[in-house]
Amino acid sequence: MPSIPHHPVTTSTAHHADRRGSWALVVGASIACLAVGFAPMPLWDEDEPRFAAIARTMLATGDWVVPSYNGTLAVDKPVLMHWCMATAFALFGPDERAARLPAAVATLLAALALWRAGSRWFSPATGVTAALAFVGCLLVGIEAHAATPDAILTAATAWATVLAAEPLIAATSATARLSMRRALAVGGLCGLAVLCKGPIGLVGPAAVLGLWAWGCAAGTRVAASGQRGPREVIGGLWDATVALRPLAIGVGMLAVAAPWYAAVSIRTGGEWPAGFFLVHNIGRFAAPMENHRGGLLFHVVGMLVGFFPWSCFLPLSVVLAGRRVAHGGGGLPQRRALALGLVWLTVWLVGFSLSATKLPNYVLPAYPAAALLVAALAVDACRQTTWPHPRWLTAGVVSLALGGVATAATVLVASRHGLSDAEAAAAVGIIPVVGALACWWLRNRSPNGALAALVVTGLVYTGLAVGPAARRIATSNALPELVEAAHRHAGGTARLAAFPQNTPTIVYYARGQVREYAREQVRDWPAEAAAAAADFLRSGPDAVLIVPADHLTALEPFLPPRTAVVGRRRPLFKDQDFCLVGTFPDAGAAVGKAPARLHR
């Protein structure tokens, strides 16, 4: 990796050349890291296949207003992510990599926002380091290769925050404010975020910018008057409101987001907004959904894992940034930029810590702030004649090595509990150990080299962890292969039904609607549902049922003649197989190995 430039430039030509070089470094290194992670692998978990299925339905039906999943209204997320995926499907075909491409592009855009902020507010070295620290941490790498909305939300909110803060960073008077054009642009970005994940796309950036601008404006009034009192605080609130132009931001947001929200509300008779706002916003905040719960420190602990390897130095960075903001270290623009990073990080962490439903990806919009803080303090430390806070440095390097050991141990333990044949993926844990040794060896010989070693460690570790290592782990994702076996049995595309449990993975890989014979759909369980499932099998040789093994006995009395278990696989972390039940035309027919006959 090229050395990170550290010295300020003195001419306009040199300045532009330095910016172009640092921009090219960020783009090239980010694309390389993201590309390594694009190993072909099936869609994971519940969200990826569900969202991809919604996008594919949009493309197939031409209805880009009302999201639908398996023939039902999908109310869990707004439409921007689905639009992005459907566009990628139209350009590159409906496969897993196309579904994940929008998240990767959004991650690159968020990295460029950090490059811009770090370069303008601190130095080109800080911009490069912040961008690559963001790309080269674990959770960002995972979300950059996931068919989910979080990376898109993070890019939109990061750009909105950076563009809104820029005019106020170096302002020395209370009259500084966003231009009308900039305020509308910030509002448009918030509108995209609202189209991506709902009200949080506006509430999050507004809370960050409002609190930060209020503090800056109050500080300006205190500096001018020499007094600290209610007048300065209240006056600062007014100055911040004027500076941010909230009405213009609101107009920009509504111009982007309101047309679709109005259209989907009209098309669904109010059903979509009722389900989304009442259930998936208020409901998720008030009570845990889908057993996603955690304590108040859930997101703090989760960030120490998700921001690895840079989390090894995040606590020190937060403490040092707080000291500089409180005690006046450095210039005013740098102090304000550090204050923005602290507020940015705190608002997202605290806000989602108060929510009853918790998932690590909820606070992904805080990760740009963490990257900016760590980069600013790391670059500054490299410029000192000796390392400040050597004990913290030692603790960080040791944590880096231990993180590698923990990575390997986690994979090895998981391989004994469902991740079959994944042991080789544990080798990715060697990278942080090697990186820690390199940082320690270079700490006094070349501080810039030590920082570059940490940057490379993050990029290589993250790229391999979400690429080749994840590809190895993906062999345990059994349901996609089971659905493909159903298609092979049908001699083309199977018509699938699930008894009694359906999953988004089955729906996506079914390439069509999957019928469901579930407990909640009938009065007489299991007889009524089993009889209906058996009737489905009689409808043709391309009809295949997916049944958990412990439900075969309930189904068996109702099955038609010449029925067999034509395939079975055990999904990840399940305690039983999922079976394919199909029909065959004569006694000698079979698919692959001889089927286990249920009825002759």
List where the protein language model places each region:
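Membrane-embedded architecture of ER/inner-membrane glycosylation machinery
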Residues: P2, P8, H15, L184, ...
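Membrane-integral, polyisoprenol-dependent glycosyltransferases
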Residues: P2-W387, K574-D577
